[in-house]
Amino acid sequence: DLYSGVGTIGLTVAGDKNLTLVEVDKFAHGELLNNIESVKSSTGNSEITGILAKSEDIYDHIEHDSTVIVDPPRSGCDSKLIDTINQKLPEKLVYLSCNPITQVRDLERLTQNYQITDVTGYNFFPHTPHIECLVLLERR
């Protein structure tokens, strides 16, 4: 789970799977570690790790048979991260974005190696121009 914040998405969907969460903000990372411990104690899943790092600097943590979740800031994914994904070719991508413009920019590069399987928009902020867009992709 890249750009994981406090782990809301990754920790919710992990179940009993091995999970690595990456966050660059020190405060959010501290809260992430607290949340990881809570999830570990309630589920028994000890295969959860939180890393304090930039998402674009985690080349060795992306596996070919993994699912990568990204929920980047409005500026979108770092170009280096897109390069890493296109090199490592994880099996599936889950891309949640609050900025459809930067998401489309990133998807143009990712769809060289991935096929979009689902797109869903979410209106979490009614009466505002803000939307969230979830795109599911699978390796070609």
Please give the residue ranges for each predicted region.
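Rossmann-like S-adenosyl-L-methionine
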Residues: 1-140
